[in-house]
A protein has these predicted regions:
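Protein kinase-like catalytic core scaffold
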Residues: 2, 108-111, 204, 229-231
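A Rossmann-like FAD-binding core segment of flavoenzymes
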Residues: 2-100, 171, 178-183, 191, ...
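A conserved FAD-binding loop/helix module that cradles the flavin
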Residues: 14-21, 25, 106, 112-178, ...
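Structured loop/turn residues at beta-strand edges in well-structured enzyme cores
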Residues: 28, 63, 104-107, 154, ...
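A short, glycine/Asx- and small/polar-enriched loop/turn
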Residues: 44-49, 106, 199-204
């Protein structure tokens, strides 16, 4: 069983330290994981499906397989549905541009979901649909509150439904480094989680990132806390996707490490790892020894 990926790592968008936990748990499942590699051809033969590969460095190889699964994303169908015949502007790639009310360039036509752009996620599309429906209903009913609805989500969580699951939301550590954003990291290993140990699945990790810029924590009720608001977070472990919503809410509400750490989480649960990670960032966690200076 081989996995072929054109990019330099699996699960692009997630921090590499989270993905490495998944890789460690699953390396026995695969014969090869070929990174920086393109699939350039495939032919059916009596022996099986013969596939040709080419590395980004020009190296060529091939393999023969019983089955091949091609998973390369989706293409917007704005041109195929002939939206332009209704006057709707469609981009060269097939996307349809909308404003924050999900309205196209034609005032009475709305669009939501994958066709309006990334990220192509069902939970994003649902919220976009709510906005469009409220705006339409508000205008028909003369309800100004409904008619003023807008899609203004600060963050949209992502989940890789693997085993273990990988989930992340907001700013990632890799993005923070690339953008020169100083962050305070709180990392809680599930090896210190009673529930994870009892489940026999303590390989997981919960990570939270807080604003650690010089001006962080100077206002908005965060003065004297030594850090600013939460900017992002990620988890790898069983049911990570079920818990990432709490981190998304914390970002939307502008919470800091004290807010999250002092929120009482039920014990023993995997979800309390979020509170523990906040305590690690704040330096008040008694479940994990402080890092040596």
């Amino acid at each position: 069983l081989d996995v072929v990926e054109m990019m330099d790592g699996l699960m692009q968008g997630a921090d590499r330290d989270l993905v490495k936990v998944w890789e460690k748990m699953n390396k026995h499942r695969f014969d090869n994981i070929l990174l920086k590699t393109k699939t350039v051809g495939a032919q059916a033969t009596p022996e099986g499906i013969q596939v040709q590969f080419e590395g980004l460095d020009g190296t060529k190889s091939e393999g023969t397989y019983d089955l091949v699964l091609q998973a390369v994303g989706r293409t917007p169908n704005g041109k195929k549905i002939a939206a332009d015949k209704a006057g709707v502007a469609v981009t060269d790639r097939g996307f349809i541009n909308v404003d924050i009310q999900m309205r196209t360039n034609v005032p009475h036509i709305f669009a939501i979901g994958d066709i309006v752009g990334q990220p192509m996620l069902a939970h994003k599309a649902v919220h976009e649909a709510h906005v469009a429906a409220e705006v339409i209903a508000g205008e028909l009913q003369g309800n100004k509150e409904l008619a003023s609805a807008a899609f203004n989500a600060r963050v949209i969580p992502s989940v890789a439904y693997t085993d273990p699951e990988v989930a992340w939301v907001g700013l990632t550590e890799d993005q923070a480094k690339a953008q020169g954003i100083k962050v305070k990291k709180g990392l809680f290993p599930w090896a210190a989680s009673g529930r994870a140990i009892a489940n026999g699945r303590d390989e997981g990790v919960t990570k939270l990132l807080f604003d650690d810029s010089p001006e962080a924590g100077s206002g908005d009720g965060h003065a004297g806390r030594g850090h600013g608001k939460i900017l992002g977070g990620g988890m790898v472990g069983t049911h990570a996707g079920d818990m990432i919503g709490e981190i998304a809410l914390a970002i939307e509400m502008g919470a800091d490490a004290v807010d999250i750490g002092k929120t009482i989480h039920p014990h023993p649960t995997l979800g309390e790892s979020i509170g523990m990670a906040a305590e690690v960032a704040h330096g008040s966690c008694t479940d994990v020894p402080p890092a040596r200076k």
